[in-house]
Regions:
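Extracellular recognition modules
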Residues: 6-12
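Short aromatic-cysteine micro-motif
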Residues: 84-85, 107, 117-286
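N-terminal module-boundary/linker segments of secreted carbohydrate-active enzymes
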Residues: 29-136
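Short, conserved beta-strand/loop elements in beta-sheet-dominated catalytic cores
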Residues: 87-89, 93-95, 209-221, 258-333
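Surface-exposed, short loops/turns at beta-strand junctions within beta-sandwich domains
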Residues: 1-4
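Extracellular fibronectin type III
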Residues: 15-30
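Acidic glycine-/aspartate-rich tracts in secreted/extracellular proteins
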Residues: 14, 94-97, 158-162, 296-299
Length: 333
């Protein structure tokens, strides 16, 4: 069983002298069901279908591979766990182009070119980018900057929940910073918490890993990659329609009404359709689930920003996206 342990050894010699030794802290990570630990040089760890930046494992992170039913052979985004058993997915640095459907209500298409390390040079050799809005324009995705350019980002595989969460919604309704978050399937996600407290809880999770509340552009980076040929592409991510907000759940269609045909088995044939890849290796809960907030706001001096998002407003620039108020935005209260 995963947890923190200490080895306690008591020895007694021939003259009955006793010696007691207590070891340093030993952390045993609980591996999710149907997954196993692996190494960073395991060729089975990930496969994006093309060359990408190797995932950067932070302190306490361990690569994992899936060993259960519906084991895919492609669209395997890298997965890892932290010491508490939380699950994370690697999004490699890339540039993108919206090739159809730009500023349209119709389903569009997105092309992706993965970039080498923290540079702006693609693996196919492309090094010149438009970096302006518009259909067919190529842009370096802004999510890959956290105070400096980065080679990729780790994102939560499921909606966050408080440690000790169960399938009971009451256990996951907490508006405070006294609990630690986790990222696990099959439990009710964290709700009834202010944006300011979300910001602090995420920052407090693991400072060594630069944990933070997901920014708007980081959420977008996951969505855009899912829409490319390296994700579900032309098939919509199915909705998590669980009324109890059970992480990793899936309805029986992309737009299923609440609790209609819901499965809580994210590894099942139906469950993987709610993943960004259509396989067990993707990110879940991107559609449906609980209401989600990102670390972003319009800088319009709205009083509610101060009331509910003080920590976010006072946070470091790299931890948030701030947008300027448009000339027609007159809302002050």
């Amino acid at each position: 069983t995963g947890g923190t342990y200490y080895l306690h050894v008591l020895t007694v010699d021939n003259t009955e002298n006793k010696k007691e030794v207590i070891s340093e802290r030993i952390v045993i990570t609980s591996v999710p069901k149907n997954w196993k630990k692996t190494t960073s040089n395991d060729p089975e760890w990930y496969d994006y279908g093309t060359e990408v930046n190797a995932p950067k494992l932070g302190t306490g992170m361990t690569p994992i591979v899936y060993e259960g039913a519906n084991k895919p052979t492609e669209k395997k985004w890298a997965n890892a766990i932290t010491e508490d058993g939380s699950m994370w997915v690697w999004i490699p640095r890339y540039a993108y182009s919206i090739t159809s459907g730009y500023h349209s209500s119709s389903t569009g298409t997105i092309e992706i070119k993965f970039l080498k390390e923290s540079s702006n040079v693609a693996y196919d050799g492309t090094s010149t980018w438009d970096n302006v809005s518009g259909q067919g324009k190529w842009n370096i995705h802004p999510a890959f900057n956290y105070g400096q350019e980065v080679s990729g980002i780790w994102v939560a595989k499921f909606e966050a929940s408080p440690e000790g969460a169960t399938t009971s919604t009451s256990n996951s309704e907490y508006n405070g910073t006294g609990k630690k978050l986790q990222v696990k399937p099959g439990v009710s996600s964290w709700r009834s918490i202010t944006i300011s407290n979300i910001y602090d809880v995420c920052k407090n999770y693991n400072s060594a890993l630069n944990s933070h509340m997901m920014k708007n552009d980081e959420w977008g980076a996951v969505a855009y990659l899912s829409k490319s040929k390296y994700g579900k592409q032309n098939e919509e991510v199915w909705i998590n329609n669980s009324s109890n907000h059970i992480t990793g759940s899936a309805g029986n269609s992309a737009s299923a009404s609440q609790d209609t045909g819901t499965t809580t088995d994210y590894t099942s044939t139906q469950g993987v359709k709610a993943s960004t890849t259509g396989t067990v290796y993707g990110v879940y809960d991107m559609s449906g689930g609980a209401h989600e907030y990102v670390a972003a706001y319009v800088n319009g001096e709205n009083n509610r920003l101060i009331i509910y998002g003080k920590a976010l407003i006072n946070g470091e620039t790299k931890t948030k996206n701030v947008y300027e108020k448009a000339s027609r935005d007159y809302y002050e209260d």
